Each structure stands twice: as C-alpha cells, then as structure tokens.
Curated annotation (Swiss-Prot):
Lineage: Bacteria, Pseudomonadati, Pseudomonadota, Gammaproteobacteria, Enterobacterales
Any one Pfam family match given in the protein's UniProt record, by short name: Metallophos
Catalytic activity: UDP-2-N,3-O-bis[(3R)-3-hydroxytetradecanoyl]-alpha-D-glucosamine + H2O = 2-N,3-O-bis[(3R)-3-hydroxytetradecanoyl]-alpha-D-glucosaminyl 1-phosphate + UMP + 2 H(+)
Cofactor list: Mn(2+)
Subcellular location: Cell inner membrane
Family membership: Belongs to the LpxH family.
KW Cell cycle (keyword) present: no
Organism encoding this protein: Escherichia coli O81 (strain ED1a)
UniProt keyword annotation of Chloroplast present: no
Cellular-component GO terms for this entry: cytoplasm; extrinsic component of plasma membrane
Alphabetized UniProt keyword annotations: Cell inner membrane, Cell membrane, Hydrolase, Lipid A biosynthesis, Lipid biosynthesis, Lipid metabolism, Manganese, Membrane, Metal-binding
Listed name of the protein: UDP-2,3-diacylglucosamine hydrolase
Binding annotation for Mn(2+) 2: D41, N79, H114, H195
Amino acid sequence: MATLFIADLHLCAEEPAITAGFLRFLAGEARKADALYILGDLFEAWIGDDDPNPLHRQMAAAIKAVSDSGVPCYFIHGNRDFLLGKRFARESGMTLLPEEKVLELYGRRVLIMHGDTLCTDDAGYQAFRAKVHKPWLQTLFLALPLFVRKRIAARMRANSKEANSSKSLAIMDVNQNAVVSAMEKHQVQWLIHGHTHRPAVHELIANQQTAFRVVLGAWHTEGSMVKVTADDVELIHFPF
C-alpha cells in the first residue's frame, strides 16, 4: 500500500482537462491508497464555502466518494484556497490539517506543508500573507456579498500576477535556511511540499544527517504526485 500526496491543481472552469484528469485520479489511483493528502491550491481561487460554483460541488462529491471508499483524505490550505472551510471539508469528507503537520509513515518521520511559508526571501508576499491570514479580516471578507468577494479576488489575482512578473525566480523559491529550520524544529528527515511548481527531490543536511525535500509539481499538462511506501518515496508524473 501507499500514501499519496498532491498539490497545486489550481482547479477552475477554464481548465477542464485538469479537472477531468483529477477525476480520473480520484476514481483510480487514489482508491488504492492508504491515505490521500492534498497540500494546498486544490482550487485556483476560493472566496467562501457558500460559493455555489458547480465545480466545487462536483469536486466535493468526487473526493467524498474516495473518503467513503475507505481512503482518508486530508487537506492543508494553500495560498489560493486558504479560505476553504469546515463546510466544504465536511461535504468532501476531508480532514483539515494545520499548515505544518508531521506524519509517521512506514518508519519515516515526514513533515508536510503547502510550502509558501518557506519562501521567506519574498518579503512582499510574506507581508501580504500575514495580513490576509488575520482571522478578523477573513471574517469581514466572508461577510461581504458574493459578487463583491468575486471582484476583490479578481483584483487580488491580477495584482499578484503583476507583482510576480517583476520578481526573480530565486526570490519566489524556498529559502534554504527556512527549510532546514522547519525540518530541525520538527526533527524530521523528510519534507514534502508544493507551492513553487518546481518538482524535484533535493538532498540536504538537517538534524546533522542527510535529509530530503520533495517538491510536488503543479498540474498543468500532466499530473504530479508523491507516492510513499515502506520501500520508497517517489515523485511521479503521469498523463491526465
């Protein structure tokens, strides 16, 4: 058996091929797993569990079917869907996890997260993140009419795209010191995360031993998952 990890699908109505690929994954590979962990940015945007978007209902039903089949499903918020709440989690049969979670998997101690908190060189993003994660601001935003939230979200995405276009790739990647600090804080040898869209397995030193950082790929033209078994930790790309 295996435990599966995915992230950064950025599901939206404008990318039906990704949605179709995810549905096939849920109906196939996911049903064989010990557990499925979604490490954020499942959706391109999330403005509240009360959004009647048909895609959200479709995905909730599909994930719930996996959960009902006996495969526990877990979710860590990303920078795009950090407002996904308890209502959608309940509808989809997912368990919401904190932004950093340590798992004991087949004899390995593994830290999982979305990954945006590791990008500490991007001071502008980290300041924005701290602001939008304030509970009072989230409560205020979610109390706004849906059409207002949609306008605000669209403006924020446009501003983010413009800001990122002028940033270097290095600034938007993880900070190595932040990686080591997180792994040593939790006393782990393995870290699995997404966010950067740069799939790779990196070897480093943490806790005075060889350690590994596994980065999930985004679902653009193919799927990406990390498959953890008793024998191996694999970063796998597969066609939709």
